[in-house]
């Protein structure tokens, strides 16, 4: 241990260590265990982390194979040097559940948390592969909806995570297109009455700094680039006219290992 260093310097040094290594070190002493669970330290460590890329082939795969799907790329230095044959050995915890040992695909990533669908489309699962922590969430109409994980972007050390649900079918379909949001702090879904279903998603969503982005279309067929801001009481929607790319390559999910704790009401998930 770094026993001879001031605590603030020790914390600064440890914040530069990859989260996967910190996870193995957390039982070294009580002080480090507490430090690695401190939201301020976790956020600082996340800000210094290298980004990896998960290749998602959209077919069901066992989560025991998750490590074979990860290609390590440090996006901070990608402009200067990039060799796709070079990777970092990142070993993550597998998803352990005998009833659902496969997921259909990874939906989105936010702060080291992966939002996934199970093969039977009965539930969502939020999963931190670095810590092994999971949270199961009941959801309906998963074949007809798009989901994205995000949070309210504020100056607090601990983010308030949410899941946004939009329909992917036009309004004249028989599908329920009401927008919904899942609050981790309350463990419940609620309908966003103030969000008009004037458009529907036509692409997978991505999350950046807590906000959601995707291509959408209104009922006349006009394509838009949509940005969703997660707010304390719901969401704010901003759109601009844009052309969806004619060709989409393999679906990729960027991923950064982190020590973020999944909250469940006032408790942490297992």
From Swiss-Prot:
The positions making up the signal sequence are none
A Pfam family annotated for this chain is F-box
Q: Which residues form the F-box domain?
A: 1-45
State the CDD domains in the record: F-box_AtFBW1-like (cd22157)
Under NCBIfam families, the record lists: F_box_assoc_1
Q: What is this protein called?
A: Putative F-box protein At3g24700
Q: Which organism is it from?
A: Arabidopsis thaliana (Mouse-ear cress)
């Amino acid at each position: 241990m770094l026993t001879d260093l001031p605590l603030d310097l020790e914390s600064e040094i440890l914040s530069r260590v990859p989260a996967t290594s910190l996870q193995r070190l957390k039982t070294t002493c009580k002080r480090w265990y507490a430090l690695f669970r401190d939201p301020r330290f976790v956020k600082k460590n996340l800000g210094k982390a290298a980004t990896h890329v998960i290749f998602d082939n959209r077919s069901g795969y066992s989560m025991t194979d998750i490590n074979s799907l990860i290609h390590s790329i440090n996006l901070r230095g990608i402009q200067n040097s990039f060799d796709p044959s070079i990777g970092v050995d990142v070993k993550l915890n597998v998803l352990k559940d005998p009833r659902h040992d496969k997921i259909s695909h990874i939906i989105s990533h936010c702060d080291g948390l992966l939002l996934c669908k199970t093969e039977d489309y009965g539930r969502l699962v939020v999963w931190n592969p670095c810590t092994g922590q999971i949270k199961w969430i009941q959801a309906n109409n998963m074949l007809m909806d798009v989901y994205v994980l995000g949070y309210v972007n504020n100056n607090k050390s601990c983010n308030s995570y949410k899941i946004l649900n939009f329909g992917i079918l036009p309004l004249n379909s028989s599908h329920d297109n009401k927008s919904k949001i899942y609050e981790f702090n309350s463990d419940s879904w609620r309908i966003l009455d103030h969000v008009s279903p004037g458009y529907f998603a036509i692409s997978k969503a991505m999350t950046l700094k807590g906000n959601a982005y995707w291509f959408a279309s209104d009922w006349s067929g006009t394509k838009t680039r949509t940005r969703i801001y997660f707010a304390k009481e719901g969401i704010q929607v901003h759109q601009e006219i844009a052309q969806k790319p004619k060709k989409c390559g393999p679906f990729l999910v960027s991923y950064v290992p982190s020590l973020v704790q999944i909250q469940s009401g006032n408790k942490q998930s297992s």
